[in-house]
Each structure stands twice: as C-alpha cells, then as structure tokens.
Amino acid sequence: EKLGIRLPIESHVLQAFVTEPYKPLIKGVVTFGAGHFYVSQSDKGGVVFGGDIDGYNTYAQRGNLPVFEDVIAGGLTMMPCLSRLKLLRNWGGVMDMSMDGSPIIDVGPIDGLYLNTGWCYGGFKATPASGYCFAHTIANDEAHELNKAYTLDRFAKGYTIDEKGMGPYPKAH
C-alpha cells in the first residue's frame, strides 16, 4: 500500500510439524486432499507433515491449536501409525495467498516494478519454471507467453483462474 497499489492477496499462517526420526516409512510426498494433509519423510528420518492454513489474516509465524488438532486428526486418519511418534517441533510460515490461488507474475503499474507474489502453498515448487518466465518479463518489460494469464488486472476484469480450490479459502470452491 506504500506505493498506492492494492494487491488482491492475504497473508495466512501455514503450520508444519516434524517428529522424531523413524525408520523409512514414506517414499515421496503423500497427500490427503479431503483432509488438507500432506506428509513426507526427511533424510534424517523425521516425518514432516502439515495441512490447512489458519483461517485469518496474520503476519505471525506461529500457528493455533484448532489447525494443529485438525492436521493431527487428518494425519491419524490417513496413517494411524503416526500416533506412536513423538512430535519434536512445529512452526508457522506466512503464505501470500491470492484470491484465486494462482500467482501474480506481471509488469507492475509503476515503471521498473515487477510483481511475483500470491503463490499460496506451492511457490517454491514452481520456482524453476516461474523464475525463467519472470526473468523474461523483467528483461523484456512484458509477460512471457506462459505467464500472460497471471496478471494483476485479471481480478478487476473478472478473469480469475480456477485452481480447483487452492486459494485462501479452499473449502469454499
């Protein structure tokens, strides 16, 4: 807002959890869409898992008990064996959530300003491809062919992108 630009994004906390090390149990990442739960295992054996965002805007990097309980319940529904593991720690990270679940990758409304925000849950997973497209956008001062749909003005024009419930209110889609 300091630049006079209102972005259609909200900041929400996404919690993650890790257990004590355990023998190899999970290869890859397992997700449970109905319960908003995901789980994987680190190289050191810790079971890493998480779920839904806290349901309000915040910049705090800590989660709240209702989401903690919901994530644990989803995990135990999918993998009851997790109940025997000791939880070592949990943490929260701030997610910049666009209203349709898709990022904003665009030339900004101010000369020399470029936007790459609103990635919701998975921005780091898309970094190689989006980085290539964003570099093109900066170098040419126009969107790459692959990110032309991800403009800031799509919200004002009503051209939101249906990401199948990946925005800040996934249960509302």
Residue ranges of each PLM-predicted region?
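A generic alpha-helix surface/boundary motif
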Residues: 11, 69-70, 129
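Active-site lid/adjacent beta-loop-alpha segment flanking the redox-cofactor pocket in flavoenzymes
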Residues: 6, 21-112
